[in-house]
Amino acid sequence: MDDTNKIIYAFVTYTLLMLVYTAINIPYSALGGVLSGNPNERVSIQSYRFVFGMLGGLLVTSCTLPLVKWFGNGNNEMGYQLTMLVMSCLGVVLFLICFRYTKERVSNPPHKLSLKTQLHVLWQNQPFKILCMAALVLLTSMVLRTTLAIYYVKYVLGKEDLITEFVTLGMIGNILGCACAQPLSKRLDKKAAYVYLQYISAILSCIAFFVPNEHVLLAFLVYFLWCFFTQMATPLLWAKMADTIDYGVWQNGLRLTGLVYASIVFFIKLGLALGGAIAGWLLAYYQYQANVELSEATKSGILTSFTLYPAIGSILVALIMTKYNLDNKTIKKITADLTQKSNL
């Protein structure tokens, strides 16, 4: 197979992989809204989900190259193929176990409404629209920053040999942040906590802008704290999705679980794409070229793109979420009303 056909093959198979994965991930994500009707338990569910998901990511990152070496025995091409095959089979088994042994505790009565009607009804759900906008801006700014992390370490800090340590430290911060979401939600209103966390993320991003290049340990610490506080908000966001579903039931009697999660996941995927694209556009704008000595202006552009632009994104998310009207008091009322109706 020549190089052109290899590229076409890689593009087609990767696109199909993402389509299938998204088709699996939407009902998997929606499980968080039907495993429990308790808003606090939903935060706990999402915390466990993201902690173990990120641990899995860390495990894959750590094990991939050793497995490639072991399976390939000198043939890296064969090593990668067999490693991906093993990981894919393991993923399928884990998905099957998940769907086989989870039990939905929130009923989702069937209805015969057309997709057009469902979308019209969903568009009346104001909290849902707020979450869509917040998810889009949030993921765009997060992906922008994480994409540029390696460029920041290599060109701004001048420590290419520490890229792996920098990224790994960020992943550890992500895991610890997700684990702390549940204790935080018990002490603060979920809406207020989410807004505060966005402002903290913005402040930490701005602090990173002023960290001198020679203070590598401080740069690592600030990035760790940014990952910690940013990811602490992630389980709260996913728990809020279930709250907007309950709001829709309370508002019009329709539980559109699948459509809500599918729609918000669409905006999340759009944010992922935009964040990666904007990172590339900014690198081009600041005249980045690989494997050459970069000008101070280019390095300054990378620093600004890694710190200040994501900070603006976090502030925008916080401002958007101030319009979100489902605080803990409102959610408790909605939950009580729905429980009373279900008992009639």
Where are these regions (language model features)?
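Membrane-embedded alpha-helical bundles of multi-pass transporters/translocases
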Residues: 1-344
